[in-house]
Design a protein with these regions (language model features):
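Catalytic alpha/beta active-site cores
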Residues: 1-209, 213
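Extended amphipathic alpha-helical segments enriched in small hydrophobics
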Residues: 213-225
Length: 225
């Protein structure tokens, strides 16, 4: 096999963005009762998990409930991903909490805000006409977290395409197209293109087609770089 000419952690990141091989162990917690979800999260952390996902279905989630959910969790020590019904509002609560506690610059946090794939592709519409309100809010969140390099605001949920029957190549193509559309829409909303790219992440599916899935991830890194 011909040498790619780059090491792991080097452009175009075919072998990954990290030079080490320390993978995180991720588990998602369904949040119905914040206290119960917190107990489950602490149990998972004590069992070796170091990346937590919180799926919050409840609308009107409050700052007090967020404090209950994250009680006893050392936020800088782990990675967190928030998804659910009103992720934009939850993002505002989380960012405010991190800034209040002085941990925003250390925190590794991502939000599954995805009006293009979860909204337009899956449901046929945005949260507002033409999506202007959606992208204005995303632009605002990006500006708030401009200096926090480990906080990602937008997640391209590529797994939705796979679950709808797309091939590996189609999933990759649709995901990159959505990523490009995000950059275009966010720059139209006044966000610098480089900053918009830093605040975006991709979430792909993994099927049993082992070698092609590995090739998909490698291709995704190279093409997006």
């Amino acid at each position: 096999i011909r040498f790619l000419g780059s090491q792991a952690g080097e452009f175009p990141y075919v072998r990954g963005t990290r030079s080490h091989n320390r993978w995180r162990v991720h588990q998602t917690v369904e949040v119905k009762c914040p206290r119960e979800a917190n107990a489950e999260a602490l149990k998972l952390l004590n069992s070796g998990v170091d990346s937590l996902g919180f799926s919050i279905a409840k609308e009107g989630f409050t700052a007090e409930e967020l404090d209950q959910l994250l009680a006893g969790i050392s936020i800088p020590a782990i990675e967190m991903v928030f998804c659910g019904a009103q992720t934009g509002s939850i993002a505002e609560l989380v960012i405010a909490k991190l800034e209040k506690e002085g941990t925003a610059s250390e925190a590794h946090v991502a939000f599954s805000i995805d009006p293009l794939v979860k909204g337009l592709s899956q449901k046929g519409d945005f949260c507002s006409p033409n999506g202007e309100k959606c992208f204005a809010k995303i632009a605002s969140l990006i500006e708030k977290t401009r200096e926090y390099k480990h906080i990602r605001i937008v997640t391209v949920s590529a797994g939705i395409f796979s679950n709808a029957g797309s091939t590996i190549v189609e999933e990759l193509a649709f995901a990159l197209s959505a990523g490009n559309d995000y950059i275009a829409r966010l720059t139209d909303a006044g966000v610098d293109a480089e900053l918009a790219a830093r605040k975006l992440r991709f979430s792909f599916s993994v099927t049993s087609n082992y070698f092609l899935e590995i090739a998909k991830f490698r291709a995704a890194r190279m093409l997006w770089a």
